Curated annotation (Swiss-Prot):
Example GO molecular function: glutamate-5-semialdehyde dehydrogenase activity
This protein's name: Gamma-glutamyl phosphate reductase
Entry's localization field: Cytoplasm
Swiss-Prot/TrEMBL GO biological process terms: L-proline biosynthetic process
Catalytic reactions of this protein: L-glutamate 5-semialdehyde + phosphate + NADP(+) = L-glutamyl 5-phosphate + NADPH + H(+)
Ribosomal protein among keywords: no
Gene: proA
Keyword line: Amino-acid biosynthesis, Cytoplasm, NADP, Oxidoreductase, Proline biosynthesis
Pathway: Amino-acid biosynthesis; L-proline biosynthesis; L-glutamate 5-semialdehyde from L-glutamate: step 2/2
Family matches, as InterPro entries: Ald_DH/histidinol_DH, Ald_DH_C, Ald_DH_N, Aldehyde_DH_dom, G-glutamylP_reductase_CS, Glu-5-SA_DH, GPR_dom
Protein family: Belongs to the gamma-glutamyl phosphate reductase family.
Length: 415
């Protein structure tokens, strides 16, 4: 039996146990995990350093190395986030709807765990802990399949979590890591309908597209983030500068950072030169149309591929447009339904943009960087969904549940 089949079978057995666990038992396990991450941080950081050195030797980009890196502060922040989960309301068992029929039947819809959640993700060790603990909180088992770039970190993190589960009342097998990171194990997960209830990809556009295209297991799509800001003709120059710089430069490697900037042609002529210069001074490589290249000599001529690119790096495509309608058409053609923003003092233009743009989160006069479970007040998230079924936007704990209908009677029969 392959590693994937073996560990998925163990997770399925654990899921049957998890459904019976109380909130108190799950929270106790989460506390054990948080303590374990703190107490064994030297081991984790040592193993993470192996991944970092290997990544540098392989020529991974600085942005990928940054996502891969765990230092003491980041690791302690991860442990703190696990403890925050303890304080969040457990959605399992929540009553969503109750109907009392005239014949005496009581019909109640409640939240229940999904079962076994598969996670396939790239060089982000924090996802290993985030995914595992979110699944445990919601009564699920999880099968983790990270990338080869983070294998030492992932093995260390999962071993710490399993030791912590051994100190709790939750089954140790509720968390499984596929250590073979070959393409073959990914393909096995794609078609493991008997072992997985859902598959969640976390990573770049290529990974997500691959999973959506090839998986027969139901997929919760955490979409790529080709996010846009559109600066309308009436946008306040100071606010526009602050929002755009924040949305691009605060953390370029995350999915809610903008990858493309659209500027009304009149605003560009009046204020664009200063903003483009500020972006260049911040180390952002600009790829623009002819107007942008004229206004900012350091900008490179954009190619067609740039309009649809998710750079996850300090690179920004910039295009001038005639009006808000053209901006919306451009976003509908090249966007990924993630997070889009309009900067304007025109309420009608803002309303049009927020209605017409098809995205999980649509902003007026704010940075796209707020698309996040904690920032929205949802608590922790498993990812940001860009699909329309089951869940959309930041997926908190309820997104890791399904529903069950409980019917209680006293001998009723249908006639």
């Amino acid at each position: 039996m392959s590693e994937v089949l073996q560990k998925a079978a163990l997770a399925k057995e654990a899921a049957a146990e998890m459904v019976m666990k109380t909130t108190a038992e799950k929270n106790e396990a989460l506390q054990c995990i948080a303590d374990g991450l703190r107490n064994e941080r030297r081991l984790i950081l040592t193993e993470n350093q192996k991944d970092i050195e290997a990544g540098r030797n392989r020529g991974l980009t600085p942005d990928i190395i940054d996502r891969l890196t765990l230092d003491e502060k980041r690791l302690l922040d991860i442990a703190d986030a696990v403890e925050l989960l303890i304080g969040l309301e457990d959605p399992v068992g929540e009553s969503l709807e109750t109907i009392q029929k005239e014949n005496g039947l009581s019909i109640e819809k409640i939240r229940v765990p999904l079962g076994v959640v598969g996670m396939i993700y790239e060089a982000r060790p924090n996802v290993t802990v985030d995914a595992a603990t979110l699944c445990l909180k919601t009564g699920n088992a999880v099968v983790l399949r990270g990338s080869s770039s983070a294998i030492h970190s992932n093995i260390a993190l999962v071993s710490v979590m399993k030791r912590a589960l051994g100190l709790s009342k939750l089954p140790i097998d509720a968390v499984q890591l596929i250590e073979d990171t070959s393409k073959e194990t990914a393909k096995q997960l794609f078609t493991l309908n008997d072992g997985l209830d859902v598959l969640i990809p976390r990573g770049g556009k290529n990974l997500i597209d691959l999973v959506v295209r090839e998986s027969t297991v139901p997929v919760l799509e955490t979409g790529a983030g080709n996010c846009h800001v559109y600066i309308d003709e009436s946008a306040d120059p100071q606010m526009a500068s602050e929002v755009v710089i924040n949305a691009k430069t605060q953390r370029p490697s995350v999915c809610n950072a903008i990858e493309s900037l659209l500027i009304h042609e009149k605003w560009a002529e009046e204020h664009g030169r200063k903003l483009l210069n500020q972006l260049t001074e911040k180390g952002v490589e600009l790829r623009g149309d002819q107007v942008i290249c004229r206004l900012e000599p350091q900008a490179k001529q954009a190619e067609e591929a740039d309009w649809g690119a998710e750079y996850l790096a300090p690179i920004l495509s910039v295009k001038t447009v005639q009006d808000v309608q053209e901006a919306v058409r451009h976003i509908q053609q090249y966007g990924t339904n993630h997070s889009e923003a309009i900067l304007t003092e025109n309420a009608e233009h803002a309303a049009y943009f927020q209605t017409a743009v098809d995205a999980a989160a649509v902003y007026h006069n704010a940075s796209t960087r707020f698309t996040d479970g904690f920032e929205f007040g949802y608590g922790a998230e498993i990812g940001i969904s860009t699909q329309k079924l089951h869940a959309r936007g930041p997926m908190g704990l309820p997104a890791l549940t399904s529903t069950k209908i409980i019917i209680k009677g006293n001998g009723q029969i249908r006639v």
